[in-house]
Regions:
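N-terminal glycine-rich FAD/FM-binding segment characteristic of electron-transfer flavoproteins
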Residues: 1-301
Length: 301
């Protein structure tokens, strides 16, 4: 039996989320296949160390028909995926076309088909039995530690060119420039409307550089155009699980908490002592961010 893992990369390095998915696939004692759009044979050939037996290389994750053919022709019944926006969209398409059920916010998969999932914005867990012979699992990050393996990987390049008769057309592609991937960052500095405007974001950028962190924002900030949409974390944005999450000037609505509540440590800075975020915080500072953040920067040198 084979398991397919969707592979994402961060600056030529396989993401930690994809490495963890490969570890889970090996724990299920299945043959582990990977799917990637990164055509770099030198690097891909090293992915045996991450637990992959075979890698399928396609031009683009938007070439759905080619991906569906890979799944059908190889008898793949189990798909493990990081919970990124790209793979959520891809998984929804595959689910519809191939009649695969989807389990989201997955915390644990057992060999007997039992699945544990995070529900109610991380406040509870649901336990289910999958009696179907196929399933797509959208995995929460950091549910296992990724492991190294001694495997040699086979590389298969798939002809996924769109035919001339296809209605599919790529109009534009934009590269998101990030110093550190938000999905894989150990430390995330996030800010909200408490910063009062985009002109005050420099101190957030400065703190992120000092701590080798990624930057993020709340939905209202993204909606207002203060920060790019790909930095939005929350129920309708990215769901992240860093080791440390700073929430600066964010009230802590349940929709935002849904995207960050699996962070190992949450530090809140807010001038409102009644801000809901303090209830979810491991550490909290009541005060003006415009006074506190510069003091933190000064203490870091």
């Amino acid at each position: 039996m084979s398991t397919l893992v969707f592979i994402e990369f961060n600056k030529n390095v396989i993401s930690e989320s994809s490495s963890q998915a490969a570890t889970i696939a090996n724990d299920l004692q299945n043959e582990v296949y990977g799917l990637t759009s990164k055509d770099d044979e030198t690097y891909i050939s090293s992915l045996g160390s991450k637990g992959f037996d075979k890698i399928f290389v396609i031009d683009n994750f938007n070439h759905y028909s080619a991906i569906e053919e890979i799944i059908k022709s190889n008898g793949i019944k189990t798909i493990l995926s990081p919970s990124s926006n790209t793979f959520k969209e891809l998984s929804s398409r595959i689910s519809t076309q191939l009649n695969f059920p989807i389990a989201s916010n997955v915390l644990k998969i057992e060999k007997n088909g039992k699945i544990s999932c995070s529900i109610f914005s991380g406040k509870a867990e649901s336990h289910m039995i999958n009696d179907n012979d196929s399933c797509i699992y959208l995995l929460n990050k950091n549910i296992v530690e990724s492991q190294d393996f001694d495997k040699k990987v086979d590389i298969i390049k798939v002809d996924s060119k769109v035919s001339e008769n296809s209605s599919f057309e790529v109009l534009e592609q934009k590269l998101i420039e990030e110093d550190i991937s938000l999905n894989d960052a150990d430390v995330v500095i996030s800010a909200g409307r408490g910063l009062k405007g985009p002109e005050n974001w420099q101190m957030i950028e400065d703190l992120a550089k000092k701590l080798n962190a990624a930057t993020a924002c709340s939905k209202p900030v993204s909606d207002a155009g203060w920060r790019p949409h790909h930095e939005h974390v929350g129920q309708t944005g990215l769901k992240i699980s860093p080791k440390i999450y700073f929430a600066i000037g964010i009230s802590g609505a349940i929709q935002h908490l849904a995207g960050v509540n699996s962070s190992k440590t949450i530090i809140v800075i807010n001038n409102d002592p009644e801000a809901p975020f303090f209830k979810a915080a491991d550490y909290g500072i009541v005060g003006d961010a415009f006074e506190i953040v510069p003091k933190i920067l000064n203490s870091l040198g």
